Curated annotation (Swiss-Prot):
Start and end residues of each WAP domain: 27-72
Protein name (database record): Notewaprin-b
Cystine residue pairs: C34-C60, C43-C64, C47-C59, C53-C68
Assigned keywords, A-Z: Antibiotic, Antimicrobial, Disulfide bond, Secreted, Signal
Localization: Secreted
Species lineage: Eukaryota, Metazoa, Chordata, Craniata, Vertebrata
GO biological process: antibacterial humoral response; innate immune response; venom-mediated disruption of cell wall in another organism
Function: Damages membranes of susceptible bacteria. Has no hemolytic activity. Not toxic to mice. Does not inhibit the proteinases elastase and cathepsin G.
Length: 75
């Protein structure tokens, strides 16, 4: 494909991506407002691997939080 054809295709794709779907144009907004964002602890990365943690502690992941914790042992 020539560079002119690629530019034309890119332009058409850009226009298509910016069009609002017809189905959402005639729908009214739902009533009410969104509630405040729930309070969550900030994402903290105390460690990156077990070797950064002191002593026997391991680097444990809980969602986006990484922290050094004492290990548990399962029998």
């Amino acid at each position: 494909m020539s560079s002119g054809g690629l530019l034309l295709l890119l332009g058409l794709l850009t226009l298509w991506a910016e069009l609002t779907p017809v189905s959402s144009q005639d729908r009214p907004k739902k009533p009410g407002l969104c509630p405040p964002r729930p309070q969550k602890p900030p994402c903290v990365r105390e460690c990156k691997n077990d070797w950064i943690c002191p002593g026997e502690q391991k680097c444990c992941r809980y969602g986006c939080i990484y922290e050094c914790r004492d290990p548990i042992f399962v029998k």
